[in-house]
Amino acid sequence: MSEHNPYGTMHATTIITVRKGGKVVMAGDGQVSLGQTVMKGNARKVRRLSKGDVIAGFAGATADAFTLLERLEVKLEQYPDQLMRAAVELAKDWRTNKYLRNLEAMMLVADRSVTLAITGNGDVLEPEHGTIAIGSGGNYAFAAARALMDTDRSAEEIARRALEIAGDICVYTNHNVVLETLDAE
């Protein structure tokens, strides 16, 4: 437990993005845990931004993530149809701004052409194998998705199955899956 939060650490979620077969799918589970307690099982941590042209998912402190999503929306308005540029500008602000520097969250964002992970360390990472995952069950979901990429399964089927596997292993991930899909280039 921290001195500021008597309930312990907030653990929340698994988010995965899969790009395959002309589709990009982002999926997230719905669990929010506070310490050893499941506070909510149907949270929506994957959503559309920028008039539906961008999908975003977050892991970490919810209020921090919403702050970052709002800032990303502003960057997308400044740099329309330039997700990479908007993400880099957000990461620069996140790293250098005294207030933003303390935000505890990670984000995955995707549009028709690119998928990115954005961190508070100033990282903007593009996956090389068509999939990337974050959050408490991110490594499990990522490994499962990588194993399924060579099968005949669709991007949606891979994302859903990867989250199911993560939910079977990670106590901070449940099986309430929310999916968003875009046509990819």
From Swiss-Prot:
UniProt-listed GO biological process terms:
proteolysis involved in protein catabolic process
InterPro entries on file: ATP-dep_Prtase_HsIV_su (IPR022281), Ntn_hydrolases_N (IPR029055), Proteasome_sua/b (IPR001353), Proteasome_suB-type (IPR023333)
Q: Where in the cell is it found?
A: Cytoplasm
EC number annotated for this UniProt entry: 3.4.25.2
Pfam entry (one): Proteasome
> What GO molecular functions are on record for this protein?
metal ion binding; threonine-type endopeptidase activity
Q: Which residues bind Na(+)?
A: G167, C170, T173
| Activity regulation comment | Allosterically activated by HslU binding.
- Superkingdom: Bacteria
Keyword list, A-Z: Allosteric enzyme, Cytoplasm, Hydrolase, Metal-binding, Protease, Sodium, Threonine protease
- Catalyzes what? ATP-dependent cleavage of peptide bonds with broad specificity
- What GO terms fall under cellular component here? HslUV protease complex; proteasome core complex
Catalytic site? T13
Q: How does it assemble?
A: A double ring-shaped homohexamer of HslV is capped on each side by a ring-shaped HslU homohexamer. The assembly of the HslU/HslV complex is dependent on binding of ATP.
Q: Which HAMAP family does the record associate with it?
A: HslV
Primary role: Protease subunit of a proteasome-like degradation complex believed to be a general protein degrading machinery.
Q: Which family does it belong to?
A: Belongs to the peptidase T1B family. HslV subfamily.
Cross-referenced PANTHER family: ATP-DEPENDENT PROTEASE SUBUNIT HSLV, METALLOPROTEASE TLDD
Any idea what this protein is called?
ATP-dependent protease subunit HslV
